[in-house]
Amino acid sequence: MFGCLGNFAYLCKSLQTNKTMKQEINPKDTNRAIAFELWTKSSMPMVTLTKTFDVTRLRKVSRKRGLKFNMLLCWCIGRAVSKIDEFYMLPQRQPTDDGTSEMEWKLYKYDRMAINVIADNVKGGLSFCDVAVSDDLETFNANYMHLTETITQTCQDILDDEAVIVGTSAVTGTELDSIVNQYSGIFINPFLAWGRYHKGWLKTTLPISFQFHHAQMDGKHAARFLEELQRIIHSI
């Protein structure tokens, strides 16, 4: 009982701290105007880039400090995406303003981000939670551990509808060269996926696949994010 009340108080505190809202913006007033016009009409607007990362430092910190490798990687991802302006904008299909059943593409701007994490729950299924991006590792780790433990036990997702979400998926049952996600037309947020890291003689490597909607960003923005992610991993 007290555990449930504690979880409820935690969620209420988080909601009180984050009362900001996403805002609809005119694509023509942004640097995504042409891309938005072109790629929201495409039958396949998603792009996947795969880069092999040197995660030697990440693995050492994980072992030395007793922190989860996946948590550390998600923290690094959050720090990297927060430095790229294009991540704060996301196209979405929404009902038209005339009240009909028609749908249209709109562009939204967010002022905060969260990392979506998937966890195995006690019923043998999967549960999801959104962990707020933070520059502070201890804060992020506390939120990550609390939320993943909560969804594991309750089998109830904890999601943040007012943050731009960066999806993640760790398929650690095997080493993988690349993961290509399918486009459903529903889940269009940025998405990173990886398998098991490879332990070599001198370094540990991990291929990470990054999928994004081309209306949201171009290849140069994605490349800058991947370079920034590697830099942050090295500097942790």
Residue ranges and their predicted role:
Residues 7-17:
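Short, positively charged and aromatic/hydrophobic N-terminal segments
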Residues 22-50, 70, 163-205:
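Flexible, Gly/Pro-enriched loop and linker segments at secondary-structure and domain junctions
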Residues 41-60, 111-135, 205-211:
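Acyl/amide activation-and-transfer machinery of modular secondary-metabolite enzymes
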Residues 58-84, 206-225:
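Acyl activation and transfer enzymes in specialized metabolism, enriched
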Residues 87-130, 162:
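Small-residue-rich loop/turn and linker elements
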Residues 119-174:
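Helical lid/core segments from catalytic subdomains that handle acyl or acyl-like groups
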Residues 138, 186-236:
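Active-site-proximal acidic secondary-structure segment that organizes catalysis
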